[in-house]
Amino acid sequence: RCMRLLLIEQPVARDFREVSTALKLITDIERIGDQAADIAEIVSNLKDEAYIKRLTHTVRMGRLAVRMVHDGVASFINGDEALADETIARDDEMDALFLTVKNELVELIKKDSSNADQAIMFMMIAKYLERIGDHAVNVCEWTKYSETGVHIKY
C-alpha cells in the first residue's frame, strides 16, 4: 500500500525519505518486540527460582532500553535530531552495562558452575536488552536520515 502511494503521488524527496524511513523503522520496532517477548519468556521461566545474584545492572539496562526506545520513536515523530543524537550517545552506557553484566556472570560461573544455567539465562536477558538499545539507535539513525538526507551508521 505504501509503495502504491509512492508511485501514484510521486512525493518530493523529503516526503519520500519520511515514508522510506517509516518502512525501515517497522523492522527495528518489530525486532524490539520480538526481543521483549523473549525476555518475558525467560523471566516467566525463572519466576519461581531463587536468583543467584541481584540483577542491579540488568534492571538499569532495562530502564535504559525503555528510555532509548521511547526517545528514539519520539525523535522520529517530532523530527528531533538532538534527541536522536542523545539517544545514540546512550548506547555507550548500554554497552558498558552489558560488559559489566557479562563479566560478573562469567566470574559467578567460574566460582560455582552449578549456577551456569541461570547465569546463561541472565546473560541472554542482558544481550536482548543490549540489542534493543541497538535497534533504538537504528531508529535514531533513520530519523537523522529522514531529516537530513544523509545516512550515517553509528
Stretches found by the model and what they are:
Residues 1-154:
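Cytosolic, long alpha-helical scaffolding segments
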